[in-house]
Amino acid sequence: MDFSLLKPNENFEFEKYFDAIIGAFDTVGRKVKIQKKDKKVSSKVESAFLKDNTDIYNVSFQTEKAIKIKIEVDTNPPLLFDTENKLLLQPKSFMTRCFNLSDLFAGKMHALVFRAWGDRLKGRDWFDFEWYVRNDYPLNFEHLRERIKQFNRIDMSKDEFHEKLIERLSSANIGNVKQDVYPFVKDPHVMDIWSNDYFMQLAGMIKYK
């Protein structure tokens, strides 16, 4: 689970929320342990999007088999994003503050274009890209631009980003993209249309906020 502060705070301490988290799980009969995880990076793949300012925690609890939830907290987030409050009803009614979809779209496109995994492709980025375009959500380019500045040290215009996106979409091995997604979809035939040209045409349909 990914979380972000609303503004940078190098002194943020997630530990002070532990009691509240443990108590929330306890109300539904789950005993949990929370441990801060050391950020040991053994390869460039693992470090691709792991920032120095991201704290990582493991929340573990026991069901029929042990479940572990990884929580990441970005204490130095790229700015120029908007949030909204969403009502959830389970396990009890509560409000949660979320990035809006235009900013989540921006984060997804940053990952798709700049994720430095060599020959490995995270097909779920491509699946989500298709979902945002098909559902007509606009992309907040100003937030995307901030992400690129912070992660990649580049100040990129909209046209420059589009060129970089087309380069990525045209050169990727779509077979590898599909292989990463197959375990997560009920009907693999929904990806029959996927091709380099298909995604390049989707790129031309992106609406910017």
Sequence positions of predicted segments:
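A short glycine/small-residue-enriched secondary-structure motif
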Residues: M1-S4
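Structured mid-to-C-terminal alpha-helical surface segments
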Residues: L6-K209
